[in-house]
Each structure stands twice: as C-alpha cells, then as structure tokens.
Amino acid sequence: LRRWTLDVVRQVVETSPFTPGVSIVAPAYNEGVNIVENVNSLLQQKYPKFEVIIVNDGSKDDTLEKLIDNFSLIEVPYDYVYHINCKPFKRLFRSTDYHFKNLTVVDKTNGGTKADAVNGGLNVAQYPYFINTDSDCILSKDAIYQCVFPILLNHDIIAVSGTMSMSNGFELKNNEIVEFKTSSNPLAVFQDLEY
C-alpha cells in the first residue's frame, strides 16, 4: 500500500502546479577537494521544483573558485533581507548554464557555526520547505520525494528526517550510492551505530 501511495503522490507532484518547492541548503567550509562532485550529486534530485543553495562560509581554500569555474557562476545583484540573523553576505552567484539553473551560491563571512551558514542560505531560499544537509553529503536521487511524501499525506507534520549512514565502504557510481557495505573497521561500525 505504501509503495502504491508513494507512486500516486509522485504522479500528482510531477503534474500539479501546487507542488511545494524545496530548497536544499548546504553549507561549505574548505570543501574544495570534493565540492564539485557533491554539488553535482545534490543537483541530480528527481523532483520538479527545487533549488540548491551552497553557502560558502568563508572558506580559505579553493572551494569558491571551483564552484565558479565548474558551474559557470557569475556574481548577481540580489536584494535580500536578513530574515534570520547571520554574518553578512559578500556576494551571491547564479549560473549562466541552463543545466545549473537551480543552483545559487552564497559567499558570506564565516559565522563560526554551521547554524549561521544555514541561516544565510535560508535568507535567500525561495521555497517554503527546506532540507538542511552538508555539502559533503550524498543524497539519494529521490530524497526530496521521501521528505515531502509524509508532509503531503499529513499536514500536521512539520519536520521530517532521513536516514544517515557513514560513507565507509559505500560504492558510488555517478554520484549515487549503488551498494551499501559494512566496514570491517570497528571504529567505522560504531560510527554507523551512532548515526
């Protein structure tokens, strides 16, 4: 029954003009090593109305430069209001490439906490629902559907959480998890239990 219901919700969401939009907010601090692959992963969501907001939280490495170069970003003027307190923005970027039309990059002063970076992303979010993740996380391609599904079925629900696992031993293909493997490292096993 749940599978059938999910399929019906998916069909309605894909065709309805009332589909709720979702903003994925992902802070990044010194993530230059993996930022391009991870942002590509976030952009592969199978959902009709979403945006990805990467918040460069004062990185001291090449995180911002890699984002600009790989996603054809240009600085854009943006009138925003700080609805939620955070350290000041330096610049805002959007892509000139249609394939990345739903990507926004905020370059802001480091706030010292992840919460400050998330607040910065929420200040530019255009949708009523948001997913708070890290820029080094890999989301399943239907993660937004999995989060929106319970909300559409029960309007009393105000928050949804996903299952998190450590990437120790995961097999990735095209920025998607294709196989889960249990690590042989006892420390990694305890990390999995913690999450």
Put a short name on every predicted segment.
Residues D134-I138:
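The conserved acidic donor/metal-binding loop of glycosyltransferases
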